[in-house]
Every structure is written in C-alpha cells, then in structure tokens.
C-alpha cells in the first residue's frame, strides 16, 4: 500500500486564522494562523505550520509536540521558572502534560509534529506486536490482516 508523502513549500501554504484561548493570554494579540500539513495513517499524529504575532501566553501541551522554529523568536519559561530562547533552526520537544509560559516579542513561525499520547502498556504492546510481524516476515500489516490474526490467535488459545 502506498502512503502519501508530505511535501509543501511553506511560503505558499494558505494559513487559517485561529487564536490562543482567551484565558491563557497574558498580553498582546492572541491571533494565530496555522494549517495542518498532513496526518499519520493511524490519526495519532499530524504535522502543522503555525505562527503568531507579538503575544505572551500560558500554554498547556495536551499532546506530545516536537517542532523546529522557522522564523522569529520565542522565550519559554518552564514550570521551574527557567527561561529558554528559541529562534530559527532551534528544535524543541514538549511531552503531553507540560505547562509553559511563552513570550513572542514580534512574530514566531514553526513547523510542529503533534502526537496523541497513548497509555504506555498499549504503546509497548503495539511495538512488540509489530516487531513480531517483522520477525515472521509480515511487513505490510493491514488493519484487516491484524484483525484476522488477532481473532485467530484468540480462538486458538
């Protein structure tokens, strides 16, 4: 099965207007612009282009987020009160559940990959399951094949 490959010239992506939740805004203009660039086949992750203007706000990461800054700068203060600067070329990762305070003096533009977190035993089980399929030589595991294999294994127990 062929999957679609993400390819975008970021300067030509039409962004949609959004905003930072009003009760999270500390100062400035909470308007944002973003566009989902692509989603994973399991719908647990997506890539997004996101930007904002001069603003300061609190942020709660309800998904894992990894990103690279394209332009502008942001100053993030973590829960321990430590401030870090992020500028063009910088890469960051914020696990789900992280809280931070952000300040953008002018503008900030990033490409981010957001991923839903799953309960650790489920994630480990999935990795073991996929490894088992690779070991026995099954590399293209369709949902139908997985369902039939699971049903068969259940009936044979």
Region spans (language model):
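A short, N-terminal "cap"/entry segment at the start of jelly-roll beta-barrel domains
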Residues: 1-43, 144-157
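Acidic/histidine-enriched, glycine/proline-rich intrinsically disordered or flexible terminal extensions
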Residues: 120-157
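Conserved short histidine dyad/triad with adjacent acidic residue
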Residues: 43-61
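Ligand-binding loop in jelly-roll beta-barrel domains
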Residues: 88, 96-121
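Glycine- and acidic-residue-biased ligand/ion/polar-headgroup-sensing regions
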Residues: 54-55, 62-79
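Short acidic-glycine-tyrosine-enriched beta hairpin
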Residues: 80-96
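Short glycine/proline-enriched turns and hinge-like loops at secondary-structure junctions
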Residues: 60-62, 80, 104-106
């Amino acid at each position: 099965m062929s999957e679609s490959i993400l390819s975008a010239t970021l300067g030509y992506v039409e962004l949609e207007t959004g905003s930072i939740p009003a009760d999270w805004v500390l100062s400035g203009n909470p308007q944002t612009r973003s566009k989902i660039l692509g989603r994973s086949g399991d719908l647990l992750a997506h890539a997004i282009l996101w930007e904002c203007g001069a603003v300061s706000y609190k942020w709660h990461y309800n998904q894992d987020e990894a990103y690279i800054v394209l332009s502008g700068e942001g100053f993030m203060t973590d829960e321990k009160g430590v401030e870090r600067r992020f500028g063009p070329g910088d890469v960051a990762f914020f696990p789900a559940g992280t809280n931070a305070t952000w300040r953008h003096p002018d503008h900030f533009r990033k490409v981010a990959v957001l991923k839903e977190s799953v309960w650790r035993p489920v994630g480990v089980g999935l990795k073991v399951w996929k490894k088992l399929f690779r070991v026995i030589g099954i590399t293209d595991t369709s949902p139908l094949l997985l369902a039939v294999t699971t049903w068969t294994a259940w009936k044979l127990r």
